[in-house]
Amino acid sequence: MKIAFIIYHEVLDDRVTATLNGLNIDYFTEWENVKGKGHKTDAHFGTRPFPGYNCVRMIAFPEEPILQQLIYKIYELNEGIEKEDDKIRLFQMPLERIV
């Protein structure tokens, strides 16, 4: 089992939602208006100097093939995003148990 966190700029929410729907991934926890800054990326703090927010979706994957399909789709989405700072990030980790 794996768990993945998808982190992306709020303007990409429709694209991420469509991607998840296309893969029949209808199970996730979402955080909106997330403030943050990645390594060598612009900050998103929801302020005038640092506009915008991020969104985070946490998804547990009992089966790894579905996660691999999502990773492939994120690579595809990122090809269409010019600015490196705006690319979608996915962090994958082992998941030991779901209770």
Language-model regions, residue ranges each:
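Positively charged, small/polar-rich N-terminal and surface patches that mediate targeting and assembly
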Residues: 1-99
